[in-house]
From Swiss-Prot:
This is V-type proton ATPase 116 kDa subunit a 1. The gene is ATP6V0A1. The chain crosses the membrane at residues 389-407, 410-426, 442-471, 536-555, 574-594, 640-659, 726-750, 772-810. Keywords: Cytoplasmic vesicle, Hydrogen ion transport, Ion transport, Membrane, Synapse, Transmembrane, Transmembrane helix, Transport. Its main location: membrane.
Length: 838
């Protein structure tokens, strides 16, 4: 469990790989996923590195596979994913893969080109078929005497007078249906009404050969007279992207052409079907293997990209690399290198040599599917400094608990728990589906967080005795109204004249003692319910907040002890602990003291702890209306304030002065501190001892002692310490007030829940009729929808964000610097999971 509370111990190691074994060794390290390679060629351009040609070849293969995948998805063919993890191909297998992918790509491109040409030809023949079919009725109307009257404007009056025969030219074609109105207006205006347009809709939509979309089109025929109008009409048709087709003038010719067109369409349809069948066979065969091909190609690309980070000696026979790796995994790394050397057939073993360094290692926190979500919450604020206390284990409990304090409702907690349990039970099936829905994936990745939030909300809901704004009467009430009639002389007249009556717990038998669990359900119907609950939740918020912050300060002690910084303990932790305990810890003691020192008989005389706490800072003790809580309170409070004030210069001045004294003393003695690094020629054996990173000088914000290369700046140290002291002292006040959001959001959630019940469910239950019974079905559906949308989703998200704030700011800033950088090992896991980002 030690690795859960601190990041893993890391070491910098040097790898020496034979050129013929480097590829296989890096492949095995990728399968292991425990080493992070450093770039040893930062000044070398990406395009000038050793294996850039291999990377380009892999990118070209990846491009071809993406093209094939696009065609598979376009054909709605499911891609088979068996979860197989194929081995990395050898470099010599790249030629076969390239040839295979080239063949598939060329075959698909050829099929697509031929299919597009066939579909274009098929579209033209289909349009011509409809033109021949639709225009027959247009020509039949030419023989109608009424047409002569409609088209009389096409003839000159002199020609009409001479009785010249009616000879009109025409063009026929097909146009998109939505362009017909604009097309008709354009013809009318340009030709000044001297054309006659007839159009008819094609019932079935036609497939566009380029896009594959189905388009609704119409057949048209335009009658005109003269070459000038003919040219205008053709230009307009061209502008509207209308397809023009030759149409014979005689019925016999049209009939013969239609017969030939139908025959060609049938033949073409047969060819198209055969082409589509062949395309489907090619794509289905590719769909079975494309996932494996993707993994192979991207593994190869990742390996060559990693090899580009290595140095190559002048003989071109050896590659050297520097890697960060966990100390606990050194044996498994050695075994992986040995396995890679054997696969390559090399006889020279690869060497792993631990190095001495003063560089800060990356932070690596081991996680599993349960702790991963909580670790992500911490890392979102900042990656932990190397080997400092990891807040994630404590967040597992405190985060869902503080969320539940704000969200506490038994009914809502049960719903949230059921949703989380569903995701947990079906996690294997959901993971195998690899959903692309980003919102669902985010919620699913936090399923264990939601589960704990639901369980804790159920618990706090029982404490509040709140279930969908109603109380559960599990043990009966501890209050009784009967003694008030016998001992307090309540009468029927008093009940009639007084709208509100208050039970007196001082009367014997009225209050039977504390409720067995949670809050007495009688408070749900009391008029002063809010006053009682607000007092309870406000004090509870302050108590939880101060305990949470004190725990954070105590965790800083573990950091100081681990990093061997006694100065930070005596001049940092101790005054911080005393300052917070003497002021805000005392406030918690006052609250508990009042709860225990006053009972129902003396509660009327109980003073306000808040007023006493304010007067404590003002040194104001002249108010006789607010009597002292205990004997000697004035002296103790004055002493605590003085102690807290003394802690301020203790934190502000002492540390810079001590650091300056130590610096001058070392300078006088001529000694230097090298941050714990041993100077000299260290061992180069594989099992050589490495420097303990716990003793390294880490760049923290604690003002540590200067190293050999640093110059002590007293002014900077004073300024930094002043900022830290002011931030801590003011933060204690503001952070304590910030925890009042626990009370505020809990109140808001309870009030929203009550409003929803009153405005929706209560309305449905008030209708005492058969219609009301049927209407209650729809009312309950609306209530359920609003409960999930508003109280579970919106209110849940609000409480989640506030819980984040309390952990990131109020809790973690007491001990967590978060200035490290994450350990990013070279691993094939993202490739196997389908996350192909470079």
């Amino acid at each position: 469990m030690g690795e859960l509370f601190r990041s893993e111990e890391m070491t910098l190691a040097q790898l020496f790989l034979q050129s013929e074994a480097a590829y296989c060794c890096v492949s095995e390290l990728g399968e292991l996923g425990k080493v992070q390679f450093r770039d040893l060629n930062p000044d070398v351009n990406v395009f000038q590195r050793k294996f850039v040609n291999e990377v380009r070849r892999c990118e070209e293969m990846d491009r071809k596979l993406r093209f094939v995948e696009k065609e598979i998805k376009k054909a709605n063919i499911p891609i088979m994913d068996t979860g197989e993890n194929p081995e990395v191909p050898f470099p010599r297998d790249m030629i076969d893969l390239e040839a295979n992918f080239e063949k598939i790509e060329n075959e698909l491109k050829e099929i697509n080109t031929n299919q597009e040409a066939l579909k274009r030809n098929f579209l033209e023949l289909t349009e011509l078929k409809f033109i021949l079919r639709k225009t027959q009725q247009f020509f039949d109307e030419m023989a109608d005497p009424d047409l002569l009257e409609e088209s009389s404007s096409l003839l000159e009056p002199s020609e009409m007078g001479r009785g010249a025969p009616l000879r009109l030219g025409f063009v026929a074609g097909v146009i998109n249906r939505e362009r017909i109105p604009t097309f008709e207006r354009m013809l009318w205006r340009v030709c000044r009404g001297n054309v006659f347009l007839r159009q008819a809709e094609i019932e079935n939509p036609l497939e566009d050969p380029v896009t594959g979309d189905y388009v609704h089109k119409s057949v048209f025929i335009i009658f005109f007279q003269g070459d000038q109008l003919k040219n205008r009409v053709k230009k307009i048709c061209e502008g509207f992207r209308a397809s023009l087709y030759p149409c014979p003038e005689t019925p016999q010719e049209r009939k013969e052409m239609a017969s030939g067109v139908n025959t060609r369409i049938d033949d073409l349809q047969m060819v198209l079907n055969q082409t589509e069948d062949h395309r489907q066979r090619v794509l289905q065969a590719a769909a079975k293997n494309i996932r494996v091909w993707f993994i192979k190609v991207r593994k190869m690309k990742a390996i060559y990209h990693t090899l580009n980070l290595c140095n190559i000696d002048v003989t071109q026979k050896c590659l050297s690399a520097e890697v960060w790796c966990p100390v606990a995994d050194l044996d498994s790394i050695q075994f992986a290198l040995r396995r890679g050397t054997e696969h390559s057939g090399s006889t020279v073993p690869s060497i792993l040599n631990r190095m001495q360094t003063n560089q800060t290692p990356p932070t690596y926190n081991k996680t599993n599917k349960f702790t991963c979500g909580f670790q992500n919450i911490v890392d979102a604020y900042g990656i932990g400094t190397y080997r400092e206390i990891n807040p994630a284990p404590y967040t597992i409990i405190t985060f869902p608990f503080l969320f539940a304090v704000m969200f506490g409702d038994f009914g809502h907690g049960i719903l949230m728990t059921l949703i989380a349990i569903w995701m947990v039970l079906r996690e294997s099936r959901i993971l195998s589906q690899k959903s692309d829905n980003e919102m669902f994936s985010t919620v699913f990745s936090g399923r264990y967080i939601i589960l704990l939030m639901g369980l804790f909300s159920t618990y706090t809901g029982l404490i509040y005795n709140d279930c969908f704004s109603k109380s559960l009467n599990m043990f009966g009430s501890s209050w009784s109204v009967r003694p008030m009639f016998s001992k307090a002389n309540w009468s029927d007249e008093l009940l009639k004249t007084t709208p509100l009556l208050q039970l007196d717990p001082a009367e014997a038998g009225v209050f039977g003692g504390p409720y067995p669990f949670g809050i007495d359900p009688i408070w749900n119907i009391a008029n002063n319910k809010l006053a009682f609950l607000n007092s309870f939740k406000m004090k509870m918020s302050v108590i939880l907040g101060i305990i949470h912050m004190l725990f954070g300060v105590m965790l800083s002690l573990l950091n100081h002890i681990y990093f061997k910084k006694p100065l930070n303990i005596y001049l940092g932790f101790i005054p911080e602990m005393i300052f917070m305990s003497s002021l805000f810890g005392y406030l918690v003691i006052l609250i508990f003291y009042k709860w225990t020192a006053y009972d129902a008989h003396t509660s009327k005389e109980a003073p306000s702890p808040l007023i006493h706490f304010i007067n404590m800072f003002l040194f104001s003790y002249g108010d006789t209306s607010n009597k002292m809580l205990y004997r000697g309170q004035k002296g103790i409070q004055c002493f605590l304030v003085v102690v807290a004030l003394l802690c301020v210069p203790w934190m502000l001045v002492a540390k810079p002065l001590v650091l300056r004294h130590q610096y001058l003393r070392r300078k006088h003695l001529g000694t230097h501190n090298f941050g714990g690094i041993r100077v000299g020629n260290g061992p180069t054996e594989e099992d050589a001892e490495i420097i303990q990173h716990d003793q390294l000088s880490t760049h923290s914000e604690e003002g540590e002692e200067p190293t050999e290369d640093e110059v002590f700046d007293f002014a900077d140290t004073v300024v930094y310490q002043a900022i830290h002291t002011i931030e801590y002292c003011l933060g204690c006040i503001s952070n304590t007030a910030s925890y009042l959001r626990l009370w505020a959001l809990s109140l808001a959630h309870a009030q929203l829940s009550e409003v929803l019940w009153t405005m929706v469910i209560h309305t449905g239950l008030s209708v005492r009729s058969l219609a009301g019974g049927f209407g209650l079905v729809f009312i309950f559906a609306a209530f359920a929808t609003l409960t999930v949308a508003i109280l579970l989703v919106m209110e849940g998200l609000s409480a989640f964000l506030h819980a984040l704030r309390l952990h990131w700011i109020e809790f973690q800033n007491k001990f967590y610097t978060g200035t490290g950088f994450k350990f990013l090992p070279f691993s094939f896991d993202p490739i196997r999971e389908g996350k192909f980002d470079d």
